[in-house]
């Protein structure tokens, strides 16, 4: 499908079409006036920001309308599942600010699903097929031509029952037998052409062990699990639109099996689809993300360049900023490619109100204040957050020798350069006005690199004194005292991919070059997605912060201490710059 890039969300309506449906259903008394939702992730990888969109509506609307939302792990494929993923999913949901009513697993229903499948066989609505997957696929037909019935479609019920038992015996080879629902091989919806509902895997399950060797397929599990739990509203993404009629049919059959046919159209889950969260310069397929991790093209699932929730968390995104972004782009029935600038804008706006302001110099050069007393140290006051007075203040040390950014000095500058230059004045944040010497303004090494800048300070201009009101043309610079500066590593992140739509480019490269996904991805990765600065200086107040603390390095951007950070070696991740680095957002 052709995707439009959304650079700016349109004016948001009061409620989404999904929320309006909830309002209508509750008003009409459907499902007894109840609202019960579920978030059903597969425990086969870490959640990404696309999952956050589903989490926000599943949990958010349930809370808003006094309903409940359960967490249900869709653990029907033991090949890919791991308890590591289960734990990470639970942590991510909690971090986003939500709490489930109950935790369930699709495997909780394996026995009921098995019994239901046996009933379908006895009703003549399911049969065991022993053709290969290739033959079954060929017999499905096309969207313009009907399929061909399997030669085993009318196998006797007793034979089907015996073969179905054999499928779960542990003696049946995977791929030799499958159970199919008997529906209509000429149905215009290809999913109705006798879909597979059970297959043999012969792999132990992380929860049920060796009890099951035949496992239900997704389409046979999802709706029935919703029904058995009492889910009223089942929300999923647009690729499941064509699955909805099959979802409804299986729920109807299960209601018949349960003998609940008095009101077949009510007291049942209803599926509604919405658009996925797609971002430019982002790839969100769990299969491809796993390949990145396994091939060590990134540093794990929580690499700050990854679109995983734990990656965003490690990078310094707040959960509130992610939810605000999701709320801004909304829920529609049209897939779109959202501009990364919108997400960064939401993060920037949120962190502006919560980040503590600190000083850090990433590319340092020394300044010596020649008229400042040698050995003298001053404790000055810095406001932690001008957006929130309750965050208080902290002390910063001032001394004769300081670190400033190398880009804030120019030996030969024109009139437009408003930072430090020979004969020019600038203001030091929370401190004094200083002036660069006109004669001998700096020392340089043999390569012409500036090593030391010489200035004088105005003792009457300290912040808070009347002299600080003196007007100057120069800008206000950040700085760190050389006396107590802490050396730190700073990691600067850029987009992981060179191409705007890596999903489509990946598919194109694989087709053009007949190569695997990893080979194609290596051609798309941005070689400059991570820059590590090892000779930065920060103030001690910042060095003491723990991971997941939100900081603003003044005049640079938002940062957070990394999980690798220690007292001896602080490490910081850049979250987002103070200005948009992706695209211009028209406001």
Predicted stretch roles:
Residues 85-111, 116-119, 124-127:
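A glycine-rich helix N-cap at a beta->alpha junction
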Residues 71, 75-77, 83, 105, ...:
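Active-site cores that bind ATP or allylic diphosphates and position pyrophosphate for catalysis
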Residues 11-90, 206-237:
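N-terminal catalytic cores of NTP/NDP-binding nucleotidyl/phosphoryl-transfer enzymes
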Residues 240, 244, 248-250, 320, ...:
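Core subunits and conserved enzymes of cellular information-processing
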Residues 1-13, 587:
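Basic/polar N-terminal segments that are highly enriched at the extreme N-terminus
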Residues 29, 58, 89, 120, ...:
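Residue-level signal for inorganic ion chemistry
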Residues 262-346:
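Long, charged, mostly alpha-helical binding arms that flank functional sites
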Residues 40-43, 72-80, 102-111, 134, ...:
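Conserved short loop/turn motifs at secondary-structure junctions
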């Amino acid at each position: 499908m052709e995707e439009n890039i959304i650079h700016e969300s349109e004016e948001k309506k009061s409620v989404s079409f999904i929320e309006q449906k909830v309002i209508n259903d509750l008003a009409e008394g459907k499902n007894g006036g109840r609202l019960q939702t579920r978030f059903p992730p597969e425990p086969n990888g870490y959640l990404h920001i696309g999952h956050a969109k589903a989490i926000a509506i599943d949990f958010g609307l349930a809370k808003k309308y006094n309903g409940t939302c359960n967490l249900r792990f869709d653990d029907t494929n033991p090949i890919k599942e791991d308890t590591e993923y289960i734990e990470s999913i639970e942590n991510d949901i909690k971090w986003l600010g939500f709490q489930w009513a109950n935790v369930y697993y699709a495997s909780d229903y394996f026995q009921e699903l098995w019994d239901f499948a046996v009933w379908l066989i006895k009703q003549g609505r399911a049969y065991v097929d022993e053709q290969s997957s290739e033959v079954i696929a060929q017999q499905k037909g096309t969207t313009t031509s009907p399929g061909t019935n399997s030669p085993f479609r009318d196998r006797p019920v007793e034979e089907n029952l015996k073969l179905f038992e054999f499928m779960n015996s542990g003696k049946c080879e995977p791929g030799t037998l499958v159970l199919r629902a008997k529906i209509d091989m000429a149905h215009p919806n290809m999913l109705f052409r006798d879909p597979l509902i059970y297959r043999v895997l012969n792999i132990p399950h992380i929860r049920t062990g060796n009890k099951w060797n035949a496992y239900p397929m997704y389409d046979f599990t999802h709706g029935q699990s919703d029904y058995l739990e009492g889910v009223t509203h089942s929300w999923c993404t647009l690729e499941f639109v064509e699955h909805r009629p099959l979802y409804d049919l299986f729920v109807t059959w299960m209601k018949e099996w349960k003998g609940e046919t008095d009101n077949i159209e009510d007291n049942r889950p209803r599926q509604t689809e919405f658009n996925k969260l797609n971002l430019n310069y982002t790839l969100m397929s769990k299969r491809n993300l796993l390949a990145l991790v396994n091939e060590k093209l990134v540093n794990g699932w929580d690499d700050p360049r990854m679109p995983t929730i734990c990656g965003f968390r490690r990078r310094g995104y707040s959960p509130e900023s992610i939810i605000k972004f999701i709320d801004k782009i909304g829920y529609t029935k049209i897939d779109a490619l959202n501009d990364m600038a919108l997400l960064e804008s939401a993060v920037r706006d949120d962190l502006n109100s919560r980040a503590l302001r600190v000083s850090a110099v990433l590319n340092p050069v020394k300044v010596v204040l020649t008229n400042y007393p040698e050995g003298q140290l001053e404790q000055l006051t810095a406001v932690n957050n001008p957006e929130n007075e309750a965050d208080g203040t902290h002390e910063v040390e001032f001394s004769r020798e300081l670190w400033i950014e190398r880009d804030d000095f120019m030996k030969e500058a024109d009139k437009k350069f408003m930072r430090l230059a020979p004969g020019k004045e600038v203001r030091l944040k929370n401190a004094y006005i200083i002036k660069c010497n006109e004669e001998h303004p700096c020392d340089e090494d043999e390569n012409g690199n500036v090593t030391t800048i010489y200035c004088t300070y105005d003792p009457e201009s300290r912040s808070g004194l009347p002299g600080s009101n003196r007007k100057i043309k120069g800008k206000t610079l950040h700085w760190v005292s050389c006396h107590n500066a802490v050396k730190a590593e700073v990691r600067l992140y850029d987009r992981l991919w060179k191409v705007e739509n890596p999903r489509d480019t990946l598919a194109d490269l694989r087709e053009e070059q007949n190569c695997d996904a990893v080979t194609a991805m290596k051609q798309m990765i941005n070689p400059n997605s991570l820059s590590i600065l090892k000779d930065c200086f920060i103030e001690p107040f910042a060095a003491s912060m723990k991971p997941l603390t939100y900081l603003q390095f003044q005049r640079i951007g938002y940062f957070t201490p990394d999980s690798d950070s220690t007292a001896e070696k602080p490490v910081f991740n850049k979250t987002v710059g103070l200005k948009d680095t992706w695209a211009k957002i028209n406001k």
